[in-house]
Amino acid sequence: QQYSFIIKRLFEFAVKDLFVINNVHSGVISANIVLPMAFRIDSENNGVKGDLPVSLLETTILDNEDLKILRNIIEEINTVLYTIIPGLRIEIKEYGSQLMDNGEEGHKIELMSSREGMPSFPIRMESEGIIKIISILNALIQAFSDPSICLAIDELDAGIFEYILGELLQIFDESAKGQLIFTSHNLRALEMLEKESIMFSTTNSSNQYIHMKNIKQSNNLRDVYLRSITLGGQKEEIYKETSSLKIARAFRRAGRCVKNNE
């Protein structure tokens, strides 16, 4: 009975409070296909959590419930978005009603970018980084304000301007109530977060994640990491050494093969 209670609580946590945003989420944005909007909407009776896909290729047809959810998402993210991207707000352009495949009435919509002093234009014309921020912003708002939320994002930095990434990480590090777990290749995170909050991947599959050792308060963690790549000094190898000469030689060989095959 005790274990069933624990399992039930874990299930409730996963359904309500756990967000996992993987590379597929980012991939459909990079391919300019779909904007998957991660969200959680709370209400008096019940809450809703999930991904609401909005097409980047054409208009999207939503039923009444999904349109209501989208309006709530846009209202929440616009509160924050214009401070991250100055002057930017998102609008829902409605083109009228259209029957859905199940025979119910749907609403044909398109997401538009609205900037001060400029005509609105389709959101697909924005950069990949801005679209990604929009897609995860509701989830970030939830994690920032709710201590029960755990938000995990694979490759948070992908497509996002380095300075904006640093600003977001600093704000979360200083003020967030929930938990943000993410992977990143961008070293900006090393300058914005406390060393205790960062783990590094290694080349040892049996001990794949470690904390850096011998880090002083005055050390720049980014410099320590780069130095550890070239000189070592950590308990595990964090980068398999490569040779720029061998890489250049391989490129030359490949170039000769291309010419010989022409």
Identify the function of each model-found stretch.
Residues 1-133, 231-237, 253, 257-262:
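Phosphate-coordinating catalytic segments in nucleotide- and nucleic-acid-processing enzymes
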Residues 73, 105-239, 257:
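Switch/communication elements of ASCE P-loop NTPase nucleotide-binding domains
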Residues 241-255:
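Conserved AAA+ ATPase small/helical "lid" subdomain
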